[in-house]
């Protein structure tokens, strides 16, 4: 089974595809979609086109998205919600369903502490997947963490 994890952002959208087979997790690919255009409509189109390319290239069975954290300023939250809505619609069209996890759920699933720092989450991602190189930016390790959280949830059900 292949799981796509997404950490939506207003400038960078982290993504990761992991394989979950025989209780073993492995990283297939990870990166980020760099949102460089200035008009919102173009940003949404760029994001959706990049997601389409990922879904075309990899046979994804499940998708998990990190929920929006409301600590940002209201304008950023609204923009992020628009990106998330566009992502959600595309995923529903292509895959049919997706799961959502709060940052607290992801941190707790990986570190046992819902208030863990992003660096602690990145450390656990590397440890769980036997990754020796640095994962930068943290949007990528967050996306991997979302995918791992979903894999753990699937294992429990």
Swiss-Prot record:
Detail which positions bind Mg(2+) 2. Answer: 66
Pfam assignment, any one: RuvC
> Carries keyword Ubl conjugation?
no
Alphabetized, the UniProt keywords read: Cytoplasm, DNA damage, DNA recombination, DNA repair, DNA-binding, Endonuclease, Hydrolase, Magnesium, Metal-binding, Nuclease
Single GO BP term: DNA repair
UniProt entry tagged with the keyword DNA repair: yes
Q: Identify the CDD domains for this entry.
A: RuvC (cd16962)
Please give an example of a GO cellular component term from this record: cytoplasm
EC?
3.1.21.10
Looking up InterPro entries in the UniProt record yields: RNaseH-like_sf, RNaseH_sf, X-over_junc_endoDNase_Mg_BS, X-over_junc_endoDNase_RuvC
Q: Which residues bind Mg(2+) 1?
A: 7, 139
Its required cofactor(s), as named, are: Mg(2+)
Single GO term (MF) = crossover junction DNA endonuclease activity
Disulfide pairs here are: none
Catalysed transformations (reactions): Endonucleolytic cleavage at a junction such as a reciprocal single-stranded crossover between two homologous DNA duplexes (Holliday junction)
Cofactor comment text: Binds 2 Mg(2+) ion per subunit.
Active site annotation, chain numbering: 7, 66, 139
Query: The organism sits in which domain of life?
Result: Bacteria
Subcellular location per UniProt equals: Cytoplasm
Question: Which protein family is it in?
Answer: Belongs to the RuvC family.
Q: What does this protein do?
A: The RuvA-RuvB-RuvC complex processes Holliday junction (HJ) DNA during genetic recombination and DNA repair. Endonuclease that resolves HJ intermediates. Cleaves cruciform DNA by making single-stranded nicks across the HJ at symmetrical positions within the homologous arms, yielding a 5'-phosphate and a 3'-hydroxyl group; requires a central core of homology in the junction. The consensus cleavage sequence is 5'-(A/T)TT(C/G)-3'. Cleavage occurs on the 3'-side of the TT dinucleotide at the point of strand exchange.
Assembly and oligomerization: Homodimer which binds Holliday junction (HJ) DNA. The HJ becomes 2-fold symmetrical on binding to RuvC with unstacked arms; it has a different conformation from HJ DNA in complex with RuvA. In the full resolvosome a probable DNA-RuvA(4)-RuvB(12)-RuvC(2) complex forms which resolves the HJ.
Q: What is this protein called?
A: Crossover junction endodeoxyribonuclease RuvC
